């Protein structure tokens, strides 16, 4: 457990009429960006202006605002010659400067931000199988589960440099995705993902009361093929920890706050409202709320179980059963798998050593990892598997199934083997989705 200040805190001198918030909405198809400024004083954004730069060159600028509204809005067109879509291979960010003024120094404020042009969709490949598409092209989303714990500060990393180093290592191994598991990171973490071209699937934070661990975790895992589609209706809410109206209202409030806080980060490609039934209730309503807040991203309505058939993702967790992918009306993701444990000598985290099968040493872990990728994952790509999330990025307290040790000092399997597997998966996916 930990206590104290969470997230970033700073002091800043601002004018009386300062910009409190920006809402930046890029439109990939229209090649525009709409900027809305919220200000401290009524009518404070009536003389809103915005400038877009690409590589230091001004490519668009405009004025806007509304005399009767404190929230001004401008839409800027991106010229054809400066249209640079964002992707993991080319994470181009446009610089954005926004200002407001009421004609005097006290009413003047300027902020600097950025945005990207990119588009998520689910579209059929040449065989009619739905695939995740980025900017209209099929993309294999290949990533790691990231719980975001650090030995030095649990939720808090030791430094910004440590965060960047970890994210760079993920990219160097050939992954393009992190599933941020039940944690909201400081904005700077997402900024680095934006810059590096790492896609993020963002879980909502767990909540509610005490759930029935025996039912939600043990029984459902044991009988997953039978219970995966259990309705999350009112009779189940007590078992899932959502019996009280207050806890359900709290979830809805936090869902909205999470989207509003993170929606301007281009790295986020998918919202995950529920994971493995933890605090789940009325998942279809959560999806509808997310669509109303942000219709530019994918939604993994219920990661693992209890699947209500909504959202964009047929989301599977599989640690124990033979993997059989059958394409249907949603795009298929293996949103948790693997989890091979090995407590690396000299780097063991405190507590128990939990995982899904235990390797004997580095060579055995590498062998098991390669076999899993080549024998289990690769054959399923042609059958519709379009995203995969290995458990997990690092060891954490009580869990030793990370690719990296908890102290981030060592990669447990051989790096060359991980890179080779990822390259093979990417090549196979390109082959099976080619038109």
Indicate residue ranges for each PLM-predicted region.
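Substrate-binding/catalytic cleft of secreted carbohydrate-active enzymes
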Residues: 167-168, 177-409, 413-422, 430, ...
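Secreted/periplasmic carbohydrate-active enzymes, especially glycoside hydrolases
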Residues: 1-192, 196-200, 254, 269-270, ...
